[in-house]
From Swiss-Prot:
Can catalyze the hydrolysis of ATP in the presence of single-stranded DNA, the ATP-dependent uptake of single-stranded DNA by duplex DNA, and the ATP-dependent hybridization of homologous single-stranded DNAs. It interacts with LexA causing its activation and leading to its autocatalytic cleavage. InterPro entries: AAA+_ATPase, DNA_recomb/repair_RecA, DNA_recomb/repair_RecA_CS, P-loop_NTPase, RecA-like_C, RecA-like_N, RecA_ATP-bd, RecA_C_sf. ATP binds at G68, P69, E70, S71, S72, G73, K74, T75. It comes from the Bacteria. Keywords: ATP-binding, Cytoplasm, DNA damage, DNA recombination, DNA repair, DNA-binding, Nucleotide-binding, SOS response. One of its GO terms (molecular function) is damaged DNA binding. It is found in: Cytoplasm. This is Protein RecA. Belongs to the RecA family. One of its GO terms (cellular component) is cytosol. One of its GO terms (biological process) is SOS response. Transmembrane segments: none annotated.
Amino acid sequence: MAQQAPDREKALELALAQIDKNFGKGSVMRLGEEVRQPIAVIPTGSIALDVALGIGGLPRGRVVEIYGPESSGKTTVALHAVANAQAAGGIAAFIDAEHALDPDYAQKLGVDTDALLVSQPDTGEQALEIADMLIRSGALDILVIDSVAALVPRAEIEGEMGDSHVGLQARLMSQALRKMTGALNNSGTTAIFINQLREKIGVMFGSPETTTGGKALKFYASVRMDVRRIETLKDGTDAVGNRTRVKVVKNKVSPPFKQAEFDILYGKGISREGSLIDMGVEHGFIRKSGSWFTYDGEQLGQGKENARNFLLQNVDVANEIEKKIKEKLGIGAQLTDDANDDALPAPVDF
């Protein structure tokens, strides 16, 4: 027969007291005991993408996966997040499994390359062990692993070229993510995994595209972003950049399936000013008449390129537009020391 309500409450309190004694205070708590704090974020560098993510950037203490075709802008998005974390006084690490990080390009995007922790590991096990140790130090704000496809298991490197190693990488990723997820939440570190696309053979219906490294990352990631290049930007006949579309295909901290479009300029990265113009026009802060762009009665320029240059030279105007857009849409403040004190890492859920 079921226990009476007072007896059940007493039994629960005794169990909770024993758990606190064995595992430390706060091991189990009621969700309503404390006021839920806003989720701390790291801005992406594109206000359009921050809006699509729903909380103003990438959530701290979570796993984020960025995937897409080659040269679509995956590493650029990750490096902008690194630059924004560093600008707020954070510490960043980059696990360069592809051995392809360009320090000069990273510097142009605003990354403090002198302070950036970089590792170019020999094997997938070494890469993930280094990542785990850095996360568990509790000192890291953001960690980028570029890329999952390049995390080659030690057995594959030491074996012959034609040897079969079925499922080795998937098992490696599954084990690593099991270890990392709790540590990420405790330390408030954002882990960005950059991934490549492959095609499944014999798929008749639906998309044949899939990501490398098995299914574990799909489950553990709180945010998954599909990055695609949709258009080449030209200045006359010269290609100067790409128009990029990002679809948030999974989001545990906000409604998913939102899209963002922004410009990535060659050698400069994400055009913050271009995103502000797009979002400003969309939400009525910037008026577009023909090819002219006007803000608050002041002409920004004829054509998007001239308007972009105006905002580049007039930072106060750009900041004012950004503030108005964020206030209207109610998206979070940037990762500052003050915001860090008030905001907590997003709680882990599966």
